[in-house]
């Protein structure tokens, strides 16, 4: 029986099942996504020998592709046929997507600077802004308002998924690393066997699974809010 207490398990379980059922569609999309986002940014970084030169590409190209991947997972979670073109649909709302990406990054970064806890809370509260902007075609402000609205009362259910994602990112570092100071971060590669193994597992299994789980959670919370609003609208007016 579905209860508020086991929603986290339901989302993770449904996400895993959807990942396995659609793995033939998901893995090529994940590969294409990383080729389009990570590879060019890395080449720019290597060419200029400075991480900061890759920031414009990551913001104006990789960010819309990331939002498009959210739509890709949302459509799979809804039982629709996976379309690789979804990955590029973030460019159809370019300004809103860039705005949401920048504001969300600033909110989370600011929260983590305030002793981490606010960053986690704000990350959960506003995380679905990156879904609403492409799924519901909302503006920047409305995307954050909508995310806060549908996550109200469910932050504790999303907390475990968020912490699981953070743990995976910490325990499975990337092959591409940075050396040097903040002003001049240099490109370095870590090709130790355990690093490569953990990177492959993270990139092609764990993170796509959590992406599917978050898409399932988003759909469920949207449905809950729509049901709640429909019930309120259908209540009889008892005022005299």
Q: Which ranges hold each PLM region?
A:
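Short, intrinsically disordered, charge-rich cytosolic tails of integral membrane proteins
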Residues: 226-240
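Interfacial aromatic "cap" segments that immediately flank transmembrane helices
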Residues: 3-39, 81-110, 122-173, 211-212, ...
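Long, hydrophobic/aromatic N-terminal blocks
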Residues: 24-62
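Selective recognition of hydrophobic, aromatic-rich stretches within alpha-helical transmembrane segments
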Residues: 3, 47-80, 105-145, 155, ...
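Alpha-helical hydrophobic membrane-insertion segments
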Residues: 32-35, 39-43, 67, 167, ...
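Transmembrane helix recognition focused on a "late"/terminal membrane span
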Residues: 166, 182, 199, 237-239
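Juxtamembrane "helix exit" motif at the C-terminal ends of alpha-helical transmembrane segments
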Residues: 37-49, 170-183
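Intrinsically disordered, low-complexity Ser/Thr- and acidic-rich flexible linkers and loops
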Residues: 182-190
